[in-house]
Amino acid sequence: SIDTIINRQYAIANNQADSIDLPKQRIYAMCNLRGGIGKTTLSFNLSYLVDNLLAVDTCPQGNLSFFYDNNYYAAQQTNVKDMLLPYLVPGLGKATRVASYIGATNPYFSKKNNYYIPSSEELYLLPSQLITAINQTAGLQQVQKEQALKSILYSLKTEIERELAENNLDKCIIDTSPFFAGATQLAWYAADALVIPVRTDQQSIKSLELLI
């Protein structure tokens, strides 16, 4: 209930809260179906606190990418949409070593071995492309259909695992957008756990209930 969240927030603000012993995971997705709740801010702050980390920006607004490189949109570098497209459009070659070293464009990260995969404005098109790719599996035999769907739905996870291995990284944070379709859906398949930022107001609680 909202009272539980308010009481927890009050205890934290007054240094009276005990830490919660949560299981440690490898890939986290920052999720909430409400905008302006702090997903990107929390993703950025956590990426600064943790070393050997991969940050993946799946929000088409690209705010997290901007925090790492305020000129990323003009850099013409391979982005998360480019990385996912070969799983949706047959015949395209798969990318490799997509992630960029954050310290190269943000000096505050120069002492950390952290990388990021930038966003793309074209992620707004991903939901329809994802649905089209899924619909194309309808005519396949059951085994083939299951293999094709698994390849599509776990495409982001496959690419994250590859980037983690290629860059010798330990953890991953995925920043998501406030809508579920497209890259956020793939982020849920990729993640070992969801981190859900919640403010202590009724609208935020409603959004949490909707997400769950």
What are these regions (language model features)?
Residues S1-I212:
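P-loop NTP-binding core
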